[in-house]
């Protein structure tokens, strides 16, 4: 399986380049777990300025309510109470696995800004080896370079059409939160997915996203002064 590298100044630019590459050069592979096929490749997309505008892609499933909720799931743990409850028992949330390690990476980088040890491990072998839905997110590494916090994320599997943008946007929100604690700026964001894929049911959606991107018609939103206000308005409902 090929692994591609794309980049952009902003998150939407890099993400859109990744979608185009998957659509054009992804390999069709069977997915017996869901009795379907996927279009797949390995993918790394590099965002030079994680907070650059326009910061919102229109090429994702959901809207400002869903995005606000997901950011709060990752950064604030609003759904941690679901762990161990319900018919479909949640074994974990990303926040539950991340929260105990935030203090470590902040302390590590405070003591040694050049450290290469500030890593948050999300995979838990004691659980994930026996889980039908092991964590897609494997680890997050943060580094300070040029007085800015860079973040590097590794995912074993990432649904390009239904999950990737919301994942990356929320992880950048976490990056911003950690940078604020350290008193540094926000730098680059690098997102690697060993399996960057789109399920067969979404191939039409992927093609529509790519057509919109290539025609350069209404594919982004500004965040500051527009989408941030829409998202903030959803907080009471979340």
Language-model segments: which ranges?
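Terminal, non-catalytic protein-protein interaction segments that mediate quaternary/complex assembly
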Residues: 1-238
